Amino acid sequence: EEGRLYLPGDEAIMAEQMDCLEKQYDYNATRPHEQERRAALLREMFAQIGENCYIEPPLHANWGGRHVHFGSGVYANFNLTLVDDAHIYVGDCVVFGPNVTVATAGHPIEPGLRRQAMQYNADVRIGSNVSVGAGAVILPGVTIGDDTVIGAGSVVTKDIPAGVVAVGCPCRVLRPIGPQDRETYFRGRKIDVPLE
């Protein structure tokens, strides 16, 4: 049950988790030209994965992606870490920079519960057409709306709405995505390619 305290070191849980991690090991051991094998392994590993998804190895996931649901056209750069003790839902056309962490697991603040190694989990939801910058960390229970940009190095502790640029530690909305973003893209450089 989402949000409920439990002991993750239970032997039955650990045995099941190890089976999932075996496939993740195989994925990370693939050679660069083995694209079809990578795609087949992701279909076995993930709860759901759409077309044209690409994850640069190494991928790290507590359950090897078993609780991960990716839409189509998702790209993840090196070292994507998915703490998938609960479900992670990702829409279409999402880009993860290198070294991004999406964590569904947390631990209580109360020292006695931590001494017992108690844990809780909360689903994470990331909308479509979201860009998550390098080194960002998304924490349990967070929802990020469609068309949003999460800046590099951000720590996302609370929900972020659709259509904004959000940055920082903790991550906060910097500004809405607006007309200026259809004219310039990086340090005032003019967009000179056709827009959709």
Residue ranges and their predicted role:
Residues 1-52, 171-196:
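Terminal amphipathic alpha-helical/low-complexity segments used for targeting or macromolecular assembly
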Residues 32, 59-143, 169-171, 175-187:
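Flexible, glycine/small-residue-enriched loop-and-beta-strand segment within the central core
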Residues 153-154, 159-160, 171, 177-178:
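Short glycine-rich donor-binding/catalytic loop of glycosyltransferases
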